[in-house]
Structures are given as structure tokens and as C-alpha cells.
From Swiss-Prot:
Keywords: ATP-binding, Folate biosynthesis, Kinase, Nucleotide-binding, Transferase
Name recorded for this polypeptide: 2-amino-4-hydroxy-6-hydroxymethyldihydropteridine pyrophosphokinase
UniProt KW Transferase keyword: yes
GO molecular function: 2-amino-4-hydroxy-6-hydroxymethyldihydropteridine diphosphokinase activity; ATP binding; kinase activity
SUPFAM superfamilies: 6-hydroxymethyl-7,8-dihydropterin pyrophosphokinase, HPPK
Coiled coil: none
Record-listed E.C. numbers: 2.7.6.3
Known catalytic reactions: 6-hydroxymethyl-7,8-dihydropterin + ATP = (7,8-dihydropterin-6-yl)methyl diphosphate + AMP + H(+)
Gene: folK
Amino acid sequence: MNNIAYIALGSNIGDRETYLRQAVALLHQHAAVTVTKVSSIYETDPVGYEDQAQFLNMAVEIKTSLNPFELLELTQQIENELGRTREVRWGPRTADLDILLFNRENIETEQLIVPHPRMYERLFVLAPLAEICQQVEKEATSAETDQEGVRVWKQKSGVDEFVHSES
């Protein structure tokens, strides 16, 4: 497992924390993925389509032998398994998994753009990511973002709490 990737996770339908835990556990259960770091969980106001419930957001670091496109397929599979529907752009969702960084690669295809194109504009992505990624920590502190609507919901307590949760 020679690739390191960072994934943002979000949920704003139903038991949001359970969906986040299940998503992290499903990532970790994949034979080609090991979750190595988890951020705290943040409660955030919706962005884009604002007529919806607040989100819980977090980020994870993984080690993987998957290539970026295989990882994208896995994240979409997990979203579908957890009941994600795509009816409204930026609308409510049970689970949202976005690949933020993959090694230090720049990828720009129709399917996948890495680094994630809007991550530096969104504190709900930067705050959890900066906790677990030194590469982003310095950039996050100087980024111009609206800090209102982003607050720590649950402090991190380690990977084990997430990867051993019931699915």
C-alpha cells in the first residue's frame, strides 16, 4: 500500500454520525485500504443548496494500493451502499466521500479532479483536513474562508473508534 490519499466525508440525513462511522469502516474493510488517521467531526452549515439540514463533516487519511480511479469507484460504491441519491446538486445526502488529495498528484479528467477543485474555498473541508495533513495545515491557516457555520461537533479519539464500529 504505497499510496496516501485524503478523503472528506459528510452526511446530513438521518443518523449522521452513524453514516460517517459506517463509511470509514467500509473504507477500512476493503483489502486494499487502511485508514491511518481520522479528524474530529465538525457540524457545518450547508453550502450551495442551503435549504437542508446541517452537515457533519470529517476527513481521513488512508494508505492504499488502489489507483485514484479505483479509489473513486470505491468511494462511490460506499456512498451507494449507504443510500446516497443524487437528486439535487449539493443536496441532502446520507454519505458523501470526496477524494481531496492523492499522493502529490495532479489529476484532471472528466471523472476526477485532484486536488479537489474547491477544497481551499471550504472551511468544512479544510478544518478537518488540516488536523491530519501537515501539507494542508499551513495553507489552511492562511486561506480566506468564511469560518461561520463550522464548529467542532466531536473531538477525534483515534482510528480504532471508527474502523471497529458496527456497519
